[in-house]
Amino acid sequence: MARGALDWIGAELEALDAKGLRRSLEPIGPAQGPVVQVGGRALVNLCSNDYLGLAADPRVRAAAADAAMRFGAGSGAARLVAGDLPPHGALEARLAAWKGREAALLFGSGYHANAGVPGALVGRDDAVFSDVLNHASIVDGCLLSRAELVRYRHCDVEELAGLLARTRARRKLVVTDAIFSMDGDAAPLRELAELCDRHGAMLYVDEAHAAGVLGPNGAGLAEALGVQDRVDVHMGTLGKALGAFGAYVAGERRLIELLVSRARPFVFSTALPPPACAAALAALEVVATEPSRRTHLFALCARMQAGLARLGFDVARVASPIFPVVLGTEVRALAAAAALRERGWFVRAIRPPTVPHGTSRLRVALSAAHDAAQVDGFLAALAAVLPDLPPAEPRRAG
């Protein structure tokens, strides 16, 4: 029975409908892969973050199944109570070695890590400097820290330099995505590291969309640019390129020891399930022994980038498997996604507040499980649907 106290929700949902901003869930199956079943149809999946195609890899699945039988389906408690099981420590040691750091700490999700770590490092007398296009979880973590939040223009090192020079904050924390999740471009980590060195600021890098994909060992953008030792806080996820679930922070041992006591999402959450840890360990072994997956992925990326550029899309700065097909209005993005689905392509419309008004888009994501024919097929389908989309409207401010 509906309760009167919630009657206001109906009007809120109608307002979301009117703006083209109402979300809904849509199951896929049977598992992640380059082709999935959606609504009873087989569609090529171009909106997953399973960049290396490991979520359904038999070795990764077998490791998870074995861990479930050995250690149980769940951890049963927080790590600090009775939930610290052997797979947790084994995965943390492997992650620390992979990232070239002294230690690592697991979190329940990337959102958990980003929401909790800033507050363990800074507070009321401090300042956090955050790229304006950082992920929502970073923004929320900065706000929860109660430090002054200073947002600088996207990848604008000069503006950040001025802000750091003028601040009187006790502690300074610069936070950035490595790869920006909606645009696919890379942060200028070398320049950011130089600024942080000069101004005595801590550097926090979210490698969610870079770890497993970039660098000689797949360890991320910091490895690719040779600045691993100059990043204080390495955050990454286990649920994207590694195909599992959860997240981690890697860094100096004293940093990890502080987070064990002060990172509230770690302290007050049940530990990651052992099967997720085992799956991530198996995925890390594949990353180490099969660099051909990354080579194949970036060959596909070059093909997609060239094709989208021919269609007139601005993808010159893309440095990842993420391609923004910016269409402008919510209506155009939704229409494009629907038309592509009719042709056999599963790609989502991304709308405000995920992206700024006037920049609604298709977020196209490639996987090492795709092939060149699928890239070419998508480009042909996109070219076919573009002329029939609703007309573009002037971009709104904000």
Swiss-Prot record:
Write down which residues bear the modification named N6-(pyridoxal phosphate)lysine.
Answer: K240
Could you tell me which InterPro entries the record lists for this protein? Aminotrans_II_pyridoxalP_BS (IPR001917), Aminotransferase_I/II_large (IPR004839), AON_synthase_class-II (IPR050087), AONS_Archaea/Proteobacteria (IPR004723), AONS_Proteobacteria (IPR022834), PyrdxlP-dep_Trfase (IPR015424), PyrdxlP-dep_Trfase_major (IPR015421), PyrdxlP-dep_Trfase_small (IPR015422)
List residues binding substrate. R23, H135, T354
Q: So which cofactors does this thing need? A: pyridoxal 5'-phosphate
EC number(s) from the headed UniProt entry:
2.3.1.47
Which is one GO molecular function term here?
8-amino-7-oxononanoate synthase activity
**Which residues are pyridoxal 5'-phosphate-binding?**
G110, Y111, S181, H209, T237
The cross-references to Pfam families, in alphabetical order and at most eight, read: Aminotran_1_2
- Matching SUPFAM superfamilies: PLP-dependent transferases
Say yes or no: keyword Transferase present.
Answer: yes
**What keywords sit in the KW lines?**
Biotin biosynthesis, Pyridoxal phosphate, Transferase
Top-level class of the enzyme under EC nomenclature: transferase
Transferase listed as a keyword: yes
> Which GO biological-process labels does this protein carry?
biotin biosynthetic process
From the UniProt record, list the reaction(s) this protein catalyses. 6-carboxyhexanoyl-[ACP] + L-alanine + H(+) = (8S)-8-amino-7-oxononanoate + holo-[ACP] + CO2
The protein's annotated pathway: Cofactor biosynthesis; biotin biosynthesis
Sum up the protein's function in the record's words.
Catalyzes the decarboxylative condensation of pimeloyl-[acyl-carrier protein] and L-alanine to produce 8-amino-7-oxononanoate (AON), [acyl-carrier protein], and carbon dioxide.
Subunit details: Homodimer.
Family the entry assigns = Belongs to the class-II pyridoxal-phosphate-dependent aminotransferase family. BioF subfamily.
What is this protein called in UniProt?
Answer: 8-amino-7-oxononanoate synthase
